[in-house]
């Protein structure tokens, strides 16, 4: 039995929303959970998962990007609020990225935001209800200084990473799942 992608996205959204509600940001958690794996709708990712899961015979594939599409979608959908969304989603398996390009550092966010074709290839495959805009309020409703913003992004990131892991555990091993 496999967990469908929508089941995982909604399950992760439910948990991330619950975690982020503890600091009055449930809607941010919900959006992060719903969008964090949208890139898995790509043909490349579906091929990758089939080969790496043993579902299809053949050699194993290398890694494939499944986070850039949602980071780009965040910039399109939330022009003034996109950075926290993009940072959290782009880094949910690897850690938070740097923004500016540094040739000594791989995986920075600015490079991911240039991959418009990733989003273009999957946009029509994403169920419309996952693309519905959620009303997001700025953190704590007022401007915050960079240190506060940094902490807030890390809190959201933690909500997403924990929710992603726990939703997978809930599906794979329900008897051991607990919050």
Where are each of the predicted segments found?
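Accessory nucleic-acid engagement/destabilization modules that flank
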Residues: 1-179
